[in-house]
Regions:
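Transmembrane and membrane-interface helices of multi-pass
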Residues: 2-199, 619
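Membrane-interface segments at or immediately adjacent to transmembrane helices
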Residues: 180-255
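Solvent-exposed soluble domains appended to multi-pass membrane proteins
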Residues: 237, 241-247, 258, 263-637, ...
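Extended, solvent-exposed regions of the mature portions of secreted/cell-surface glycoproteins
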Residues: 643, 660-663, 679
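Surface-exposed loop/edge segments in extracytoplasmic proteins
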Residues: 654-659
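Aromatic sugar-binding surface patches on proteins
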Residues: 661-672
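Surface-exposed, short loops/turns at beta-strand junctions within beta-sandwich domains
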Residues: 671-684
Length: 709
């Protein structure tokens, strides 16, 4: 080290600037290598990209180089801290993008910044995707970061502050130009639609990401104003329709999103011991059914769900998470049906905050939301609450309310990935003569067994509805194909996906899920063969139930009735016979709802339900009975309403263990250790349901004052 110090100390000031630039260049190349090697999965893939996409490689390097340059004017300790944070940031983000691709066939997008909670939560199920290579890579990164820090410290102080300030100003200007002009990464326009995965392959992580950021800025449509929206709404309302509206007919409407439900019998090279979906298949054979062409694979559930509920299409938005755009009330099935006398309830056996459902369900008009925190002592399949418990909750809700119900039911027990242990003994239901890895065999069998449970939960719901004997329709759809192994392992090993996934036939296979519409009031009505994208399902449901529609659903229905039931990727408009001009009014109303002034909502009260609540209803304490059991120990019996087994009792703000008897009675014990003042003084008792961080209160009761004596 002394030798290096001596060598550095003898460097002439005229050369120090050059050496600082060389160090910054080496550091930028090092950072770029980290990003692309991790993101692409190998060093060889990084070299191939640098050779085949030289322009993108150079622009990525320059952006990182100018990023370092922009920080040169800072004090050394701050400069070193920031470049260390930069390297660690790129390491984590590129690794996250790589893992996302392994799981869902998609890379990191700007909207993933809105889903950090979801990513962190699901990552607990994916620890096997981070192995010794990633750990060694991180350690090596830190060591090399230390080496670069040494040279930066030495060379930086040899360059005057004035020169460093000028370099920083120049770097900021260059950085701004590159960041706001992603077309520089290819020297061409991005007006042509390029699939996200393909853009990451060609333009690199940085270039593709900046491209998506640019696309995320939704331009105001031509001619968008109040007059134009009113003209569209008037035209929609005056369009004649064959659909019958009957205000006196009020069937219950249950919409079931079946997590990752797909027909595995489509895997022709797999041999199944039995059909894992016998009940569901019977429904499809006897009732209107078919397929839904979704826009997500292996994940992105809430995109599909929101399309169904809102009548809007993700095909009119950038390739990003749809729900992050819902930050104000928007029209939905919940609003439309509540206006016609329905109760609107969402039920989901997973966490309230996942996909920010708790907030968005309120914005789109639901009255209450049952999330997993409000299920009492549920049984589990692996890490998830059994869907049969979910269906029983839906049946209970039907019987409890007066008047018609709209239930949005979202399952979760069949959620991927499928390399974990969920059953004590996993029956072998699927085999194949094809060459499959042991992991792929396990994944296929676990998924097949989970489908059996999904099928049984559907049976429980339908048979339960029959017993209630009220006019009811049940719509069941799969939100996306299951994630069956990294890089589509099961699909490829069984030759289901073949070759280029960007061709039309492979596209349909990758995004097509089952759909069925069951009812007990249709009589001998003709069975329909259904094929649609999720945005058309909401208006189909309203028409089938003979309900009035709002403008967005009426327009959706008009387009559907004209035979345009699919809005695919723009790449495949020709194959589907789609003319973009046909969607001009549709896109205009969607912009008005999400980004515009909501002119189309004039004279409509789209205010969230005033009494919106999580769970069955507001938690309420009616009374607290105090009983002394032995010296200094007291038992508290708390009587009230809507208690849940996962609640927490607070006495003077201190958590106490709960004994759950039922929704009207919970208990706890408290020990007073030799403090007579606590026995004679007053104490505040309350009940709350906490988020999974154990701190955040998501629902709480009133408080009651008690005395132990």
């Amino acid at each position: 080290m002394k030798g290096i110090n001596h060598l550095v100390s003898n460097i002439k000031p005229s050369k120090s600037g050059l050496l600082l630039a060389l160090t910054a260049s080496a550091f930028s190349l090092f950072t770029l290598m980290i990003i692309e090697v991790i993101h692409r999965g190998s060093f060889a893939a990084f070299i191939n990209w640098a050779d085949e996409s030289t322009v993108s490689f150079v622009m990525s390097f320059l952006l990182l180089f100018f990023l370092v340059g922009a920080l040169l004017f800072l004090p050394t300790i701050i400069f070193i801290s920031l470049i260390a944070i930069e390297v660690i940031f790129w390491f984590v983000v590129s690794l996250g993008s790589f893992i996302k691709y392994q799981l869902r066939g998609e890379f990191f997008t700007p909207a993933d910044l809105y889903a950090l909670n979801e990513g962190a939560d699901i990552s607990t199920l994916m620890s096997d995707l981070i192995g010794w290579k990633e750990i060694v890579g991180f350690v090596v990164t830190l060591l090399l970061l230390g080496v670069f820090s040494f040279f930066f410290i030495r060379y930086k102080k040899m360059v005057s502050f004035r020169k460093r300030l000028l370099l920083s100003v120049f770097s900021v200007i260059c950085l701004a130009i590159i960041s706001t002009q992603p077309s520089l990464f290819t020297f061409r326009s991005f007006s042509k639609e390029v699939p996200t995965v393909e853009s990451y392959g060609k333009f690199g992580f940085i270039g593709a990401y900046l491209t998506l950021v640019e696309k995320a800025n939704i331009a105001v449509p031509n001619h968008y104003d109040k007059e134009e929206i009113n003209k569209i709404v008037k035209k929609v309302n005056e369009t004649k329709t064959e659909d019958v509206v009957d205000p006196d007919f009020q069937p219950n409407i249950i919409v079931v999103l079946a997590e990752a439900m797909w027909d595995p019998l489509l895997l022709k090279n797999a041999n199944f011991k039995e059909d894992p979906l016998p009940y569901f298949r019977t429904l499809m054979e006897n009732y209107s059914s078919g397929s839904m062409l979704t826009h997500v694979y292996g994940g992105g559930t809430f995109n599909t769900e929101l399309e169904v509920l809102s009548g809007l299409s993700t095909r009119f938005t950038p390739e990003e998470i749809y729900y992050n755009q819902v930050n104000q009330p928007i029209d939905s099935l919940a609003y439309v049906l509540r206006k016609q006398g329905y109760h609107a309830t969402a039920i989901h056996n997973f966490k309230n905050w996942y996909y920010t459902r708790k907030d968005i369900y309120e914005l789109i008009g639901f009255e209450k939301f049952f999330s997993m925190e409000f299920f009492n002592n549920p049984s589990y399949i692996g890490p998830y609450i059994d869907d049969r418990i979910l269906m029983q909750k839906a049946l209970d809700e039907l019987q409890k309310t007066k008047g018609p119900d709209f239930l949005n039911v979202v399952t979760v027990a069949s959620h991927g990935p499928y390399n974990d242990i969920r059953y004590k003994d996993l029956p072998i239901l699927a085999t194949s003569d094809m060459k499959m890895t042991e992991l792929s065999k396990y994944i296929l069998n676990l998924y097949t067994n989970l489908l059996k449970d999904v099928d049984d939960s559907i049976r429980l719901l339908i048979e339960g509805v029959k017993e209630i004997d009220e006019p009811t329709m049940v719509v069941i759809y799969g939100d996306h194909l299951p994630f069956l192994g990294e890089e589509y392992a099961v699909y490829r090993e069984l030759d289901f996906f073949q070759g280029d996934l960007n061709n039309y036939e492979e596209y349909k296979k990758m995004y097509q899920t089952p759909l069925v519409v069951w009812d007990n009031f249709g009589g001998q009505s003709e069975k329909e063969e259904l094929r649609m994208t999720p945005n058309f399902l909401g208006s189909y449901i309203l028409a089938h139930a003979k309900k009035e529609m709002s403008p967005i659903f009426r327009l959706s229905r008009d387009i559907y009735k004209q035979g345009q039931t699919i809005i695919p990727k723009k790449t495949f408009y020709k194959q589907e016979g789609v003319k973009e001009a046909e969607f001009q009014d549709y896109q205009m109303l969607q912009y008005d709802a999400l980004k515009g002034k909501q002119y189309s909502y004039a004279n409509r009260n789209l205010e969230p339900f005033e009494g919106y609540v999580l769970g069955n209803g507001k938690i309420k304490i009616d009374s607290v009975q105090v009983e002394k059991t032995k010296n200094g120990t007291y038992r508290l019996d708390i009587h009230g309403e809507n208690f849940v087994s996962g609640a927490t009792i607070f006495i003077d703000g201190e958590k106490k263990k709960i004994k759950f008897t039922n929704e009207n009675l919970i208990s706890t014990t408290i020990k007073i250790k030799g403090d007579s003042s606590k026995e004679t003084s007053s104490h505040e008792v309350s009940v709350a349901v906490l988020d999974d961080d154990g701190k955040t209160v998501i629902e709480e009761s009133n408080s009651k004052t008690i005395n132990f004596k």
